[in-house]
Regions:
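Cleavable N-terminal export/targeting peptides
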Residues: 1-35
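Internal metal/ion-chelating core segments
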Residues: 191, 195-264, 268, 273
Length: 445
């Protein structure tokens, strides 16, 4: 399925300077103080940490992130510390080099071992990359060419398919914190020409040692953004994996995205559309799509109301093919995206064999506080593959609040309620409601 010509094209782009997509790349600096480094060099210390308290009432669910089956404990704590350095070195009229090195330590307390990493801790390298970007050379526009290689991040769109380069929980701890975002190895190139961006990439995920499928992908991404409110995207990726994920080895994925505010005189109205097709013969033939419409009110607290409908195909056991959508490397872009539900999406539902309706209301009482409510209605796409006769999984209501205390500290609160539907009753013989709460403190410097 994979063309040799496509491989050559990707290799050619990667070998040419192109733009990286690492999180928070070191900005260009014109400061005279070079901290004792050669002229044109600058560096800074990077430090962040987080600590959370989590509690379940009537806990049940298992970790769909890494296919681990285990009930949750009622209460647990987890935290992380990340420290490192990042820097740049300007080249006379030839752009600049940039890079970073960092490490992450994580710890989880009082949770059963397989799920969120009970009494588990780890420390390892996180960022370790070197890149080059063109600056304003050749008159092509600021950083029109960029290339980066090493342990770095890459994020595609709003994260439905590719967003998180590192697995959490299990033997590493830090299940919810998500401090590990860098891929184990990445080579990323980007060329920007006006509103058009072309990327080529190779990504090898940093998976948990106990469930390492050696999953990797290479691909190309094209985006066209005619302003900050309107972007169209198209991506092709080809995948490899070992025997733990046979359906992923040889998989081809096509993805189309649109983030639109189509009426210039009505910027309060916005749309998001995304479609993905997965093809690996009889091993996997599936699709997923979602559509969102949002309305931003021009009033106190600036409330935004949105509705999203999402479908992730499930397997039909009556066919020879496997139609169960592979959620790949999804991640947290915003509350509700793409872990769907602070109970369901975090702890027992995956983006496969799932239909979800989401209604969200978000408000900002002031510049320091963002808060909202998210209501979900979950259904199975195919009941037979789930081993039940009802498609009604249940409904969930989440409340969240992010309080930015100052430039360094942010505190997040979550309270969630899940009422199980008939499908959960049939699968687990449980019909009690579920409750969940969280307080998380994050620090960055």
């Amino acid at each position: 399925m994979r063309s040799n010509y496509l491989r050559l094209a990707i290799t050619a782009v990667l070998l040419s300077p192109a733009m990286a997509y690492a999180e928070d790349p070191p900005p260009a600096s014109n400061e005279e103080d070079t901290h004792g480094l050669p002229s044109g060099s600058d560096w800074k210390l990077d430090f962040s940490a987080g600590w959370g308290f989590f509690g379940f009432g009537n806990s049940l669910y298992a970790n769909s992130h890494d296919e681990v089956q285990q009930d949750l404990s009622d209460n647990w704590m987890e935290g992380f510390v990340k420290g490192g350095f990042s820097g740049t070195h300007k080249l006379n009229g030839a752009g600049e080099f940039y890079g970073a090195i960092s490490g992450v330590g994580e710890r989880t307390y009082n949770a059963p071992p397989p799920l969120v990493g009970g009494e588990a801790s780890s420390f390892d390298v996180e960022d370790l990359y070197l890149g080059w970007r063109s600056g304003d050379m050749l008159g092509l526009g600021e950083n029109a060419l960029d290339f980066v290689v090493g342990r770095t991040q890459y994020k595609l769109g709003h994260g439905m398919l590719i967003y998180d380069g590192g697995s959490e929980g299990g033997s590493r701890g830090g299940f919810w914190s998500g401090a590990r975002k860098a891929f184990e190895f990445a080579a990323i190139g980007r060329v920007k020409a006006g509103p058009t961006t072309i990327e080529a990439f190779y990504l090898d995920r940093d998976e948990l040692p106990e469930s390492d499928s050696s999953s990797a992908t290479y691909g190309v991404n094209l985006e066209y953004s005619w302003n900050e409110d309107n972007t169209l995207g198209a991506t092709y990726t080809s995948w490899t994996a070992n025997g733990l994920r046979p359906e992923r080895d040889g998989l081809d994925v096509w993805n189309l995205r649109a983030y639109l505010t189509p009426i210039p005189s009505l910027k309060a109205l916005s749309f998001e559309l995304e479609y993905a097709k997965e093809d690996n013969g009889d091993l996997l033939d599936s699709s997923a799509w979602n559509a969102l419409v949002g309305w931003q009110l021009e009033s106190a607290w600036k409330p935004k109301i949105s509705y999203r409908y999402a479908v992730f195909e499930g397997d039909d056991p009556n066919t020879l093919k496997n139609e169960a959508f592979d959620g790949l490397w999804t991640g947290f872009y915003d509350w509700g995206t793409w872990w769907q539900g602070e109970i369901g999406g975090e702890y027992f539902l995956s983006n496969s064999n799932l239909i979800s309706n989401q209604v969200r209301v978000h408000a900002k009482p002031n510049e320091s506080i963002g808060t909202g409510l998210i209501l979900y209605d979950f259904h199975f796409d195919n009941t037979a593959s789930a081993g039940v006769t009802s498609d009604n999984i249940g409904a969930e209501l989440d409340w969240y609040l992010d309080w930015t205390m100052n430039d360094h500290f942010t505190v997040s609160f979550v309270a969630s309620y899940f009422t199980p539907g008939r499908a959960v009753e049939q699968a687990f013989d449980r019909d009690d409601d579920f409750y969940y709460g969280m307080i998380y403190v994050a620090y960055s410097y």
